[in-house]
Amino acid sequence: NVLEMVNYLKKIHQKPIEIIGLSAPGLANETNSCIAHLPNRLHGLENFIWEQYFETKTFVINDAHAALMAEAKFGAIKGYKNAILITLGTGVGGGILINGELYQGLSQMAGHIGHISISHNDDERSILGIPGSLEYALGNYSIERRSAGRFKSTYELIKTFKENDPFAQWLWLDSVRKLGISLASFINVFSPEIIVLSGGITLAGDLLFEPLNVFIDMYEFRPKGKITKIEKAHFDDLSGAIGAAAFAMNKTISSI
């Protein structure tokens, strides 16, 4: 388990482990010491004080926020002050970097980009009850419903898209168009230097990024001709661990 892993690292490490960073789905509390809200997942871990469990100073961070920190410290966002990272997988999440700092907001929930509405007339709702959410339009969890049972995963959709299937092409491009509208809207509000996309859906490669850039060109406000970069994340599976460690280091340094 996690404690055994930490104790093993303490044993083999030449120096004492002074801080631990932990990423998880859900929302951290105001001091980033525990998971305050973890809907429908890992019951029993809400408000669990990890520092007492590990007997080591521990900082907890949302997994999408951790992915942002990983990219900001070591990856595609390194060197940028204002950026947005969006995770595209089972659902849609994200994180926001403002003036070089992770923006968490009032309830540590900033960046839940999937829960914006892009079609208020849509009967389908997100897990928060939001009609026409971006998460429903793009998330892997909804693909079976969006395709009327034809596709079990986004991977199947993309595979059929490559076979020039008309329905698959319409469904995929409609989803990408909605993502493009959303990204253009974020650009118009935040004016970031770069937006980084991560998660399994980005494995579509050019089938995602080429039409996405076309749609963003249609909707982004560019009064000075400056264009926000759209790039793929450098890290995938390890982004949570890397970002949580970076966040813990930043919190420790800022408290000195």
Language-model-detected regions and their locations in the chain:
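Charged, glycine-enriched surface loops/patches
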Residues: 214-231, 242, 248
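Active-site glycine-centered loops adjacent to acidic/histidine catalytic or metal-binding residues
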Residues: 63, 89, 244
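Glycine-rich phosphate-binding loop and adjoining helix at the ATP-binding site
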Residues: 3, 7, 15-20, 26-82, ...
